[in-house]
Amino acid sequence: MKNENNISLPQYVTLNIQTLNSSEDKTIRIKAKTLNFPLSSEDLRDISILEKKYDQEENCAGLAAPQIGISKCIIIFAVHEDAELKKWHPDLKDTMPKTIWINPSYKPIGIDKHEDYEGCFSVENATGPVARFKKIHYHAYDINGNQIQGIAEGFLARVIQHEIDHLNGKVFLDYVAPKKIMTKEEYLEMRKKAMEQENIKS
């Protein structure tokens, strides 16, 4: 696949849903490399590729470099105020414009968790409920090596935790009991029925 600048973009590294491993590329299941500053020209090229891959997607909360075969601690994500998104994720509170983080990490604030359904480009046509910390303190660097830190709550905290998991060789299905895994079609049907019930009650 090529973008408007004729730069070839890599395909996603996908996992076999039964084994949760990839026979083609181990990048998605190993700890990614921590980057040093100043970033090399190769690092900057990889960041550009990741951003272009992200920009071509619709309804994409975030991507991590290992998802496209780049074993480096780079993530890109965005969470905007959106009424439709809030229907699916009522805990949407904090927002953040499109952001690229290098070497990100987080620490939970408290022990409270919230369960919600997640999906991933690296696990095709599968979703399941994942309990994530409701509130976290994050730390990262921008591409110039400037420190970034702050507090995230709700859906934004979930997105950050999900993407950082990729840098540690984890995917969301690692936290989901096999019997709770469903296809996206099954999930959408479940949500449709739930919303219909809510409309009846109101």
Swiss-Prot record:
Source organism, top-level taxon: Bacteria
Catalysed conversion reaction: N-terminal N-formyl-L-methionyl-[peptide] + H2O = N-terminal L-methionyl-[peptide] + formate
Gene Ontology BP, a term: co-translational protein modification
Chain residues that bind Fe cation: C120, H162, H166
Annotated catalytic residues: E163
Enzyme Commission identifier(s): 3.5.1.88
Name this polypeptide is given: Peptide deformylase 2
Species this chain originates from: Rickettsia conorii (strain ATCC VR-613 / Malish 7)
Gene: def2
